[in-house]
Amino acid sequence: MEAAADGPAETRSRVEKDSRRAIKDSPAKTQSPAQDTSIMLRNNADTGKVPALPEHKKKRKGYSPAESVKILRDWMYKHRFRAYPSEAEKRMLSKKTNLSLSQISNWFINARRRILPDMLQRRGNDPIVGHKTGKDAHATHLRSTDASVPAKSGPRGSDNVQSLPLRSSPKGQMSGEKIPEPGSAPSQKLTMIAQPKKKVKVSNITSLSSPEPVSTEEYADFSSFQLLVDAAVQRAAELELEKKQESNP
């Protein structure tokens, strides 16, 4: 058992010694990166460690070429209302862009979230030129609104000024009131303006008030009617007494 256990340890030590001798004997200038990596792989295979690749050989996250992206953007803009290419269309785009089907599918998945909403808001025919975003778009929007407000509000104000005398004149004609002359006293103007206000107040109070109470005259009429009934009853009793007296002399 001890001899079997010492066997692998001796072989590992021999391999490490041989590799060290080979590295020392070979000149450093003549060694290529491939030879270095092969030696590292051999040493790590013997020791059971995973090799670490050099930094210049690490795979970087690649991006699609600009020409391929332009072709895909053009296709998406033309079909922006149905940006779901079929399998045949994906194969056609892969031939034009020299990209794989998986790359095209991934590009469309990301583009539908990031690029398509901006494309749907455009009105032109250029899929590359985008709208202004951020502070520039907000500033242009404010300028456009400020410029459009006076243009819209100007004629409306003049129409309101011209329509005021037309609306106020029929009231005086229908009510029969005379329009005061420009040289009249200001007190007359105030009284004429105050009269409709008083009427409006009275009408509001009467409309919001409770039902009209019964006047006191109705109670007086009822009491007099009761008195008349009592007097008639007494008169009838007196007449009966008189008849009885006449019948019994």
Swiss-Prot record:
Classification via InterPro entries: HD, Homeodomain-like_sf, KN_HD, TALE_homeobox
Stored SMART domains: HOX (SM00389)
DNA bind region: 55-118
Spans through the membrane: none
GO biological process: negative regulation of transcription by RNA polymerase II
CDD domains (UniProt xref): homeodomain
Gene Ontology molecular-function annotations: DNA binding; DNA-binding transcription repressor activity, RNA polymerase II-specific
Basic and acidic residues biased stretches: 9-27
Superkingdom of the organism of origin: Eukaryota
Region Disordered, annotated ranges: 1-65, 126-199
Entry protein name: Homeobox protein TGIF2LX
